[in-house]
């Protein structure tokens, strides 16, 4: 991170204070105690407004990171990590006027820019997933956070199944720093399949993909937020995206004849669906048709062959994930 240290006399909530910038933190000290914000872990963006510097933050609910010398370390990475967060603006009134406010805003912006955060995002919003409220969630919770962070967005509402895959397969990735899926796990899978079907897939797969839990199944978002030591919520997922938090994932490839499908979460054999469809001719039997079909027609002639390749070193990890109760919480 760029070392852009500075000190200034300010007023916070009407009280005089000394503000310091350095070591990746913004601190201000006054009679009531000291307060600090981690630029990387807690600050969304900064704005100069007259002689004021408005620091847009996303802090652990209930407190800023430091309220007194004894409380130091209770924020990101300390006891506050993993708690729910909330939006809050901190206003520093510069004693030296508007020029100082502009200078400090520029310093803070340079520091934030050194973290490699995304500036341009392409966002898929699935209006049909979950409770069908993804668009409302985007307008009420997601857009305000991106606006506060100064992130430019292009929004695409999906109109039918497979739409996200089609768009991802031809999207001009040079225009964006990442893709965000406001949906459940389905749109994420579509985007991955669209990317891996491109002729330039080896380069395109490097594009970061963010996931916001707004669908029926949100296993991937929960898993990624858990690894980032954050509570699973829409706002926390957006903040992780704004911060540029990344984690590499394995991709599973399923080939059946000339068909190829890619998965990043799970893959199952649709046995139950087969039984439901094929036992339709025994509907007159009621619910007993399922058992009857399995015993008389499926098991006697069941013959399936497949080749499974897996690294032995990850088998134990897979078993742990499958047995993690909170994984699908």
Language-model region placement:
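ATP/NTP phosphate-donor binding region
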Residues: 1-182, 189, 193
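Catalytic core of DAGKc-family lipid kinases
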Residues: 158-160, 166, 173, 189-329
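Active-site glycine-centered loops adjacent to acidic/histidine catalytic or metal-binding residues
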Residues: 126, 185, 213-215
């Amino acid at each position: 991170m760029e070392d852009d240290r500075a000190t200034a006399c300010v007023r916070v909530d009407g009280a005089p204070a000394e503000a310091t910038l350095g070591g990746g933190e913004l601190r201000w000290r006054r009679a009531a105690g000291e307060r600090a914000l981690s630029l990387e872990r807690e600050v969304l963006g900064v704005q100069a407004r007259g002689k004021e510097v408005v620091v847009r933050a996303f802090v652990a609910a209930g407190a800023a990171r430091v309220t007194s010398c004894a409380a130091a370390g209770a924020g990101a990475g300390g006891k506050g990590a993993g708690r729910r967060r909330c939006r809050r603006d901190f206003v520093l009134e510069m004693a030296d006027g508007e020029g100082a406010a502009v200078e400090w805003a520029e310093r803070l912006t340079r520091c934030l820019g050194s973290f490699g955060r995304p500036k341009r995002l392409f966002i898929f919003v699935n209006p049909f997933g979950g409770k069908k409220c993804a668009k409302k969630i985007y307008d009420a919770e997601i857009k305000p956070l991106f606006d506060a962070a100064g992130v430019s967005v292009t929004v695409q509402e999906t109109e039918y199944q497979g739409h996200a895959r089609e768009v991802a397969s031809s999207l001009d990735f040079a225009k964006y720093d990442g893709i965000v899926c406001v949906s459940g796990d389905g749109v994420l899978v579509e985007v991955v399949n669209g990317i891996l079907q491109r002729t330039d897939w080896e380069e395109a797969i490097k594009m970061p993909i963010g996931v916001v839990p707004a669908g029926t199944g949100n296993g991937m978002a929960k898993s990624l937020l858990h690894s980032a030591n954050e509570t699973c919520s829409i706002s926390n997922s957006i903040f992780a995206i704004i911060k540029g938090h990344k984690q590499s994932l394995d991709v599973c490839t399923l080939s059946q004849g000339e068909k190829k499908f890619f998965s990043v979460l799970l893959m199952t054999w649709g046995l139950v669906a087969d039984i439901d469809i094929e036992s339709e001719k025994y509907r007159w039997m009621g619910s007993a048709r399922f058992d009857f079909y399995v015993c008389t027609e499926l098991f006697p002639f069941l013959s399936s062959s497949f080749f499974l390749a897996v690294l032995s070193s990850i088998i134990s990890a897979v078993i742990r994930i499958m047995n993690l109760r909170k994984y699908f919480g």
